[in-house]
């Protein structure tokens, strides 16, 4: 089961939590869920170059709080915060609510599964050899503290006539172990021969306490070696 299912979904409520954190009445649920999808699609398209890892949406009473985890926060913030203010106004128009926008810097993009997948997909689009791209990503992740990593690439790799799947793994990736902190990300490479899919699993160690926020806290604070400053920029 652990080999097939999304490892983040399998661990929700154990050491992972949801990216949409709000409650709604039955009549409002569908509308708010559709809003979340539109917000994520808009930000992903608008901030293609910002290396976005994930987008967290929270909805306190009659408000909306959007947190963007990015490896390049400067691109989102812009000169003197001009770009982030434009984004905030657009999001307020989309949600019809008072919207705040927070930026959290991803300190180690080399061990973030989503950013690794995006990087490999971009290299495939630039015609870099898929084995070289995979091996380079694996070496960088292991060098920067990952305990294990697995990468799958599928499609017409290298322009082959028949689509196939190639994978590369180093270290341990225990998908059945629920206490394992496993990050998972996917991306698509639009090549001249068709779409190639990229999947990445990164094992970052084990989380022994039962805490749904443990993995996120480790990602935000762990890179700073215990420092209380996590360079969180907030624009209410």
UniProtKB/Swiss-Prot annotation:
Residues 39-107 form the KH type-2 domain. SMART domains: KH (SM00322). Residues 214-236 are annotated as: Disordered. One of its GO terms (molecular function) is structural constituent of ribosome. One of its GO terms (cellular component) is cytosolic small ribosomal subunit. Keywords: Ribonucleoprotein, Ribosomal protein, RNA-binding, rRNA-binding. Gene3D superfamilies: 3.30.300.20, Ribosomal protein S3, C-terminal domain. The keyword rRNA-binding applies. GO terms for biological process: translation. Belongs to the universal ribosomal protein uS3 family. Part of the 30S ribosomal subunit. Forms a tight complex with proteins S10 and S14. Binds the lower part of the 30S subunit head. Binds mRNA in the 70S ribosome, positioning it for translation. NCBIfam families: rpsC_bact (TIGR01009). This is Small ribosomal subunit protein uS3. It comes from Brucella abortus (strain 2308).
